[in-house]
A protein has these predicted regions:
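Ubiquitin-like/PB1-type beta-grasp interaction modules and other compact soluble beta-rich domains
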Residues: 2-12, 18-142
Length: 142
């Protein structure tokens, strides 16, 4: 009888442990605030009829360039959907804090992600910039 109770208790503990494990965190790719693995230099990502180039230059001077294919309307929508950029929504639009796996935050390190369109400082934010096929969109940690 004691053995049966011990086996039942052990099985109950095992079932409980397995059910708690199944309730763990979701993968990074499912969290738009946590970009997935960085895109490699020269890669092509996404699917769609619009194509543009993205350049990322981090605070250490490392730069990568990759091609994005999408059907989204704005650069921000495309890059968020592909988990390349993440940030915080504000009254001014998306405050980009993470690009291609690298986080810079003006509040903590005095740097921010500057956004450029074809080499010129952008007049609009990434989430307000409509995609122009063939354009180059650049993020620089400044």
């Amino acid at each position: 009888m004691k053995t049966t109770k011990h086996i039942a208790a052990l099985l109950a503990a095992l079932v409980l442990a397995l059910s708690l494990t199944a309730c763990g965190q979701t993968a990074a790719k499912d969290d738009p605030m946590n970009p997935a693995i960085p895109v490699a230099d020269g890669a092509e990502i996404g699917e769609g009829s619009k194509t543009f180039t993205t350049e990322v230059a981090d605070q250490d001077g490392k730069a990568v360039t990759f091609t994005v294919h999408t059907d989204e309307k704005t650069v921000g929508d495309a890059l968020q959907k592909l988990h390349v950029v993440a940030g915080e929504a504000s009254s001014y639009g998306l405050y980009v804090k993470t690009v291609n796996g690298v986080t810079v935050d003006y509040d903590t390190d005095g740097k921010y992600w500057a956004f450029y369109v074809d080499g010129e400082y952008a007049a609009t934010g990434v989430d307000s910039t409509d995609i122009t096929a063939g354009a180059t969109y650049t993020f620089k940690a400044e």
